[in-house]
A protein has these predicted regions:
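Conduit-forming functional cores of very large proteins
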Residues: 1-327
Length: 327
């Protein structure tokens, strides 16, 4: 989250927004100053710190596919598409034309019309892409060509530098000031047009900005990070039936390797894990500042009162093999 009006802004690209932001279970002085409770920028995950497979070495993490299907780590990415209509010294300028219509091509069958002009469908009557339509890059495997949907049906002058002389005929003038098609095509991943802004620049050029919104889910190679900067890439996304589980039937959202703690020396993250688990059962957000925060012994006592280990460890059962281990 960057501001309260980020849904109305078109000056930031790409704009990454978490779909389900959550208030952190463990807070600190810096988070209170930044008002992360009102503008959260993360999700609370059920993390199992254990060495479970070879897919979590070198700071890699293992994700639960069922958690991803429930919305864990889902983001909305908005990218800006900018187009301009220029004016040239000889008085010519770029123009926008209306998209071709079906009734204008009477001798063309429907299949040919769809193949040749389907990428003009997102355009409105003014030749500019409409809000709410889906744009993408279309692939025609039969005729072996790839083209993106048209965002602006723009035409540019053929001649942009020569002026008209006194001895020019009407035919020469018509040739010199004719336009050629230069439609602006979409070249990114498919998405929905969120908003369209038409404005002008300092040079009196027309400027058209379109924000295209796309939904993304975590995939292999994506980087995750905790609030302590303990980051790692996704090494494996597996089904919930393959994940370890506790005797209470709790499956983790993520598995991270414990060998990353000694090398990174992130002792505060160990305290955050213990305080977060204690706050989950105590119903109180803990203070995770390493100096002067919530006492670690108090968090351990809370865990003991709720039937857990003093050190925060749990016995988990493998979903793949007939084994159990500590987490």
């Amino acid at each position: 989250s960057i501001a309260c009006n980020q849904q109305q802004r078109v000056d930031i690209s790409p704009l990454n927004l978490l779909v389900y932001p959550m208030m952190p279970m463990v807070r600190s002085r810096v988070l209170d100053l930044l008002h992360f409770s009102q503008l959260p920028a993360g999700q609370n995950a059920m993390v199992a710190v254990m060495s479970y497979s070879g897919y979590d070495i070198e700071d890699a993490v293992v994700l639960n596919k069922a958690s991803i299907d429930r919305g864990y780590g889902r983001v909305v990415i908005s990218k800006k598409q900018v187009f301009s209509l220029k004016k040239y010294p000889n008085g010519t300028q770029d123009i926008i034309k209306a998209p071709p219509r079906r009734e204008e091509q009477k001798g063309m069958d429907d299949a040919t019309w769809e193949r040749l002009f389907e990428h003009y469908k997102p355009l409105g009557e003014d030749g500019i892409v409409e809000v709410g339509v889906y744009v993408k890059v279309r692939t025609d495997w039969v005729h072996s060509y790839v083209h993106g949907d048209i965002l602006v049906n723009k035409e540019i002058p053929v001649n942009t530098g020569d002026f008209i002389g006194d001895n020019c005929t009407y035919i020469v003038i018509d040739i010199m000031f004719s336009n050629t098609a230069a439609p602006v095509k979409y070249k990114e991943n498919g998405g929905y047009v969120d908003k369209v802004l038409i404005t002008t620049t300092d040079n009196e050029y027309f400027l058209i900005k379109a924000m295209v919104r796309d939904m993304r889910v975590p995939e292999l190679g994506d980087k995750f990070s905790s609030r302590h900067g303990q980051k790692g890439v996704v090494g494996l996304i597996t089904g919930q039936e393959n994940m370890p589980f506790t005797n209470a039937g709790i499956y983790p959202d993520m598995i991270m390797n414990p060998h990353g703690f000694p090398s990174r020396m992130t002792v505060g993250k160990m305290m955050e894990l213990l305080a977060g688990k204690a706050g989950l059962y105590d119903g109180e957000r803990k203070f995770g500042t390493i100096f002067g925060g919530t006492n670690v012994e108090d968090c351990a006592e809370i865990l003991v009162q709720h039937g857990f280990s003093y050190c925060g460890k749990d016995v988990m059962y493998s979903g793949t093999y007939d084994k159990n281990g500590l987490c």
